[in-house]
Swiss-Prot record:
Subunit structure: Heterodimer of LeuC and LeuD.
Organism of this sequence: Bifidobacterium animalis subsp. lactis (strain AD011)
The record's free-text note on cofactor binding: Binds 1 [4Fe-4S] cluster per subunit.
Protein name in UniProt: 3-isopropylmalate dehydratase large subunit
Protein family per UniProt: Belongs to the aconitase/IPM isomerase family. LeuC type 1 subfamily.
Keyword set, alphabetical order: 4Fe-4S, Amino-acid biosynthesis, Branched-chain amino acid biosynthesis, Iron, Iron-sulfur, Leucine biosynthesis, Lyase, Metal-binding
Source species taxonomy: Bacteria, Bacillati, Actinomycetota, Actinomycetes, Bifidobacteriales
Name of the gene this protein is made from: leuC
Known EC number: 4.2.1.33
Length: 467
């Protein structure tokens, strides 16, 4: 019987097959690190008197706690400052490569690695961060791990794991105009639920996926974890190879040719069998937005806020009641009638150059609505920021009335100065809309960059077609 893409990558990295129910031992090609989940791992190495096994397969950056303004000034938050200085100290002591705040290659961990060509097809990639699934857009098996596992990888370059199940997510047909990768993944999560992918590697397939750019593919794989999955993957193709060619850490010369030859084998075999399969028709999709407090509570923008009675399952009904109360929404309210206070464009989900271009094209020649308190545009990496400035996108954002920031996780999460206040409502291109995610009492609607930009113009949740 044939193998799926995930099974092929797993088999290529199998050090030892587990027996009698024991986990396999898997080799890890690359581990990415940041300031939040690494301190205890370094301390564990220190206490055990160990050193990293392969320094050239470890790389760190500062992203979660970093300010996006006044980056040359002391961090005002003591806890954040401590985590950043601790990472810098640990990397110096153990010899781990670090791209700190202010470095030309600094950025969100899942944005800077692909841009440097560190992320490549067929690799196993881990990080103490759930959105490591982003790198699966290249045909890598990439997943988040806990802090104790971070220590284990530093010490051994391996992990003990039981094989993941596999699920095919087929997006058949062609996407309608105005529908983006973010709309696809939000629709998928709404369909299968936030636990629908639990224990699975999701492989995204179909013509609609194949037509996406690498930036768009990363958006989809990034949010696999919001469906409960361990990882998300897309088979590498000519789009993948074109993105990687010439990047600093991509293979060169004959090594490039050999790599591409191998990468072309990384496709699910025709006779492979998935453990589960889900199919959506691309032409049925439309711009999507969340209304509640988990990424699965979403609807098409043409719809209305649902009522608890719309849910047959008692648990979902109870969750809807709580979400409506927290979000301050009434059932039956048209999504387009929901006013927004703040717009956030950024994160490891939608802070790449393509996302910024889309937002800038919509904002060009407009001004933000008077009712909008602020619009934050935060590139996912320093390289993306520089590229956007070379293209003049920063001037469009500033003319519009937006704040153009330095790279970082920013308002995706309340771990840095970019936060919402209680009951402030945002439309955000990030990945999570949990209670308090963007600050205590914050209310978050997840959407695409196009929807966020249009909303900033009109003041209520909108699409570019509404302008």
């Amino acid at each position: 019987m044939g193998m799926t893409l995930a099974e092929k990558v797993w088999a290529d990295h199998l050090v030892r097959k587990g027996s009698d129910g024991a986990p396999d031992l898997l080799y890890i090609d690359l581990m990415l690190m940041h300031e939040v989940t690494s301190p205890q791992a370094f301390e564990g190495l220190r206490l055990a008197g160990r050193t990293p096994r392969h320094l050239d397969q470890l790389i760190a950056t500062e992203d979660h706690n970093t300010p996006t303004v006044d980056i040359d000034k002391p961090n005002p938050d003591e806890t954040s400052a401590t985590q950043l200085t601790t990472l810098e100290k640990n990397c110096r002591e153990f010899g781990v490569r670090l791209h700190p705040l202010g470095d030309a290659d600094q950025g969100i961990v899942h944005a800077f690695a692909p841009m440097l060509g560190l992320t490549q097809p067929g690799m196993t990639i881990v990080c103490g961060d759930s959105h490591t699934s982003t790198h699966g857009a290249f045909g890598a098996l990439a997943f988040g791990i806990g802090t104790s596992e971070v220590e284990h990888v530093m010490a051994t370059q391996t992990l003990s794991l039981k094989p993941f199940k596999t699920m095919a997510i087929n997006i058949e047909g062609d996407l309608p105009a105005g529908v983006s990768a973010k709309d696809i993944i939000l629709a998928i999560i709404a369909k299968i639920g936030t636990g629908g992918g639990q224990g699975y590697v999701l492989e995204y397939r179909g013509r609609a996926i194949e037509q996406l750019s690498m930036d768009a593919r990363m958006t989809i794989c990034n949010m696999s974890i919001e469906a409960g999955a361990r990882a998300g993957m897309i088979a590498p193709d000519e789009t993948t190879f074109a993105y990687l060619k010439g990047r600093p850490h991509a293979p060169k010369g004959e090594m490039w040719d050999q790599a591409v030859e191998y990468w072309k084998t990384l496709r699910t075999d025709d006779d492979a069998v998935f453990d589960a399969e889900v199919t959506l028709r691309a032409e049925d999709l439309e711009p999507f937005v969340t209304w509640g407090t988990n990424p699965g509570q979403g609807v098409a923008i043409s719809g209305v806020v649902p009522a608890p009675d719309d849910f047959a399952d008692a648990t979902e009904r109870s969750a809807a009641e709580r979400a409506l109360d927290y979000m301050g929404l009434e059932p039956g309210t048209p999504i387009r009638d929901i006013p927004v206070d703040t717009v956030f464009i950024g994160s490891c989900t939608n802070g790449r150059i393509e996302d910024l271009r889309i937002a800038a094209e919509i904002m060009k020649g407009h001004k933000k609505a008077d009712s909008i308190h602020r619009v934050l545009v935060v590139p996912a990496s320093s390289r993306i920021r520089l590229q956007a400035e070379r293209e003049g996108l920063d001037r469009i954002f500033k003319d519009f009335g937006a704040e153009w920031r330095n790279a970082g996780c920013s308002m995706c999460l309340g771990m840095n100065p970019d936060k919402l206040v209680a009951h402030e409502r945002s439309i955000s291109t990030s990945n999570r809309n949990f209670e308090g995610r963007q600050g205590k009492g914050s209310r978050t609607h997840l959407a695409s960059p196009a929807v966020a930009a249009a909303t900033a113009i009109r003041g209520t949740i909108s699409t570019p077609a509404d302008l």
